[in-house]
Amino acid sequence: FGMVESLSYPFVGDDDYKAFGFDPEATKKVSVEIANPLYGDRPYLRREILPTLATTVQRNIRRGLENVSLYELGHVYLWDPDAPSIPALPGGVRPTDEQLAALDAGLPEQPDHVAGILTGLAEDDGWMGGKRPVDWSDAVEAVRRIAGRIGAAIVLDQPAADDVPVQWHPGRAARVMVGDVFTGWVGELHPRVNEALGFPAHSAAFELNLTALFATLTGKPVQAK
């Protein structure tokens, strides 16, 4: 589909939250805080891939590249503030089964996600026609190809504008569903987000919860060896 895979550090901070329209204080309450962060201004683990992938797209655009379309596969970290506290254990002693269970219970959920951002031109000048900028339909096509490749029967559900998360254009975004199972979002980024990130107008994106998507499959995925 012409997208390039990228890897980004899974760290976020206030600037990332604000660019995507998130309330920083509310988001911090459900985010994993790093005790010794690599970057002082990004002391939290991401809850979505898009904010960290956006940083990579920004870097490419600032270096003069155009028509940047990247995707990333990776973990997100969904902290539950009501989860039990992780116990402090002494060193040099193997934890008991009960202590190991307590450690597991306190860990955040870490599903696999895939996210993509498409900017610039979807089609450049060619013998069949002129230039065409990226729009939401290109992100939808990417999602359909992912679903088709793994055999998931997705349906796009466009909610009322008030039910669309702040990072998405309220009239050009949809939930990605498999039956009654929510697996992600696809569409055009909100104009305010594109402006804050320095992206071209109408830049589009998607983010899918692959763990949830694979759980909807009735058979096991086939992998060639």
Regions found by a protein language model. Give the residues of each.
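Extended beta-strand-rich architecture
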Residues: 1-225
